[in-house]
C-alpha cells in the first residue's frame, strides 16, 4: 500500500475517532456505574497498561465500587469484582449477559466462533454445549482416558529419573506431559501431524495474548489489514485447517471400535454422522471444537500445575504435608485414579491454587439489552468483565486472602463448580466452562505422580522466598520466569 494512502487512512480514522468522542461527550449519560475519569478517545485504556490487569482492576474497584464502569476505547465496559455482585448478575441477568463481544482473532481461528467459549448465545451454542457436556467431557468419558494419563505419566516419570540431583525446567516438563495427555485424548494415538498442530496452537495462543487495538476500536478494522495482521492470522488458520482436515480424514477412514475407546474427534464425528440435531453438525464445527479442546485443555492445566509447585516450593511445610497425603493413599507402586480420590489434602492444594492463580478475568460477556444492576443502568452491548481473581481474594469473604493456606478449605463446602461465587476459576452460570472434570483430572493426576515419585528441592543458593511470583497475564496467568527445581530422590531410592 502506498505511503500516502496509508497516511490518508490513518488520518481519516483519527478524525472519525475525534468526532465519535465529541458526539459521545455531548450525549447525556444515564445512571452508569461509577468509575475513574476518562481521557478523550482512549478512555481508561491507559490504566490497564500492566502485566496484571486483574490487580489493577481490583485496586480501582476498591476505590470506585464492586460494579465499575470503564471506557476502553470505543468499548463501554462494566467490571464486576465481588462474589455478591457476581451472584446478582448470574441469578437475575444470566441470559441477558450470556452473549460474547466481537473478537477478531477468535472469529478467524475458531471458524467464525463455532466453538463453545466464543459462540454467540443461541440455538447453536446450546446444542454444542450439550454435546460437549454430555458426550465429550462427561465424568464417564473423562475416566475413560485414565489409561492415557497413566501411560503419559509413566513416560514423564522415567524422563525425570536421569535428572535426579540436577536442575530441571519444570515448566517444560509439565507442558510436555499435559500436551501429550490432552492431544492423545483429543486426537487419538495415531496422528501423523500432532506435533505440527501443537506448534501451530502455540502461535494461536500468542495471538490471543497479544494486544490488538481493533478489539478496543472496532471501527478501525482496516488496521488489521494494512498492518498485515489479518493476512498473518489467515495464513496460520489456513495451515491449521489443512492439518485438521487431514486428521478428520484419518479418523473417518479407521475402523469403528468400542465407544469407550473413542477419542474426542471420534465422538464428534459419531454425533455428526448420527444426525438428529436441530442444526446439522459440519466439519467446521468439529474442527472448531477440536481446536478449543486442545488450546483450553493444555495451557490452563499446565499453568495450574506450575503455580501449585511454585507455592509448594515456597511453603516446605505444605509440601511435606501433601507428599505424606499422596504417599499414604497409594496402595501399590504406582498412583492410580482410585488412589487420587483418597488424597484429601492434595485436593485442598489444588483448590487453593485455583483460588490464587486460576483464570483471573473470565472470558468477557456482553448484554443484549439495556438493564439495571443494583440501580445502575447498563446499556446494551456493554462488555462485562468478571474479575474472578478479585472474588477469590475478597477480604470480606476470605481470611488472609492472599496467603497460600490449603487448610482454609478443610471444613468448607466451597467448590469450583460455579455455584459458590467466591471461587469461580471455571466461570459460572450458563457460560461455565464444560471442561471442569477434564481439567481437574489432568491437574490432580500430574501433581500426584510428581509428588509421589520424587522429593524436590530448590537449586543451591536459592531460598523459598527467592522464588519470583511475578505474573504474566494472557488468557490465564503464568509465572514470568519458569520454575527451576531439583528432583533429589525417587520413591524406589527411599525404600
UniProtKB/Swiss-Prot annotation:
Enzyme Commission number: 1.14.14.168, 1.14.14.170
Pathway the protein contributes to: Secondary metabolite biosynthesis; terpenoid biosynthesis
Compartment(s): Membrane
Top EC category: oxidoreductase
Signal peptide residues on this chain, from the entry's feature table: none
Record carries keyword Glycoprotein: yes
Gene Ontology annotations of biological process type: response to jasmonic acid; sesquiterpene biosynthetic process; terpenoid biosynthetic process
Transmembrane portions of the chain: 3-23
Cofactor: heme
Gene3D superfamilies: Cytochrome P450
The name this protein goes by in its record: Germacrene A acid 8-beta-hydroxylase
Entry keywords, A to Z: Glycoprotein, Heme, Iron, Membrane, Metal-binding, Monooxygenase, Oxidoreductase, Signal-anchor, Transmembrane, Transmembrane helix
GO cellular component: membrane
Tissue and organ expression note: Mostly expressed in leaves and flowers, and, to a lower extent, in roots and stems.
UniProt cross-references to Pfam families, sorted A to Z: p450
Catalysis: reaction(s): germacra-1(10),4,11(13)-trien-12-oate + reduced [NADPH--hemoprotein reductase] + O2 = 8beta-hydroxygermacra-1(10),4,11(13)-trien-12-oate + oxidized [NADPH--hemoprotein reductase] + H2O + H(+); germacra-1(10),4,11(13)-trien-12-oate + reduced [NADPH--hemoprotein reductase] + O2 = 8-epi-inunolide + oxidized [NADPH--hemoprotein reductase] + 2 H2O; germacra-1(10),4,11(13)-trien-12-oate + reduced [NADPH--hemoprotein reductase] + O2 = 8alpha-hydroxygermacra-1(10),4,11(13)-trien-12-oate + oxidized [NADPH--hemoprotein reductase] + H2O + H(+)
Chain's role: Involved in the biosynthesis of germacrene-derived sesquiterpene lactones. Hydroxylates germacrene A acid to 8-beta-hydroxy-germacrene A and 8-alpha-hydroxy-germacrene A acids. Unlike 8-alpha-hydroxy-germacrene A acid with is spontaneously converted into inunolide (12, 8-alpha), 8-beta-hydroxy-germacrene A cannot undergo spontaneous lactonization.
Main location: membrane
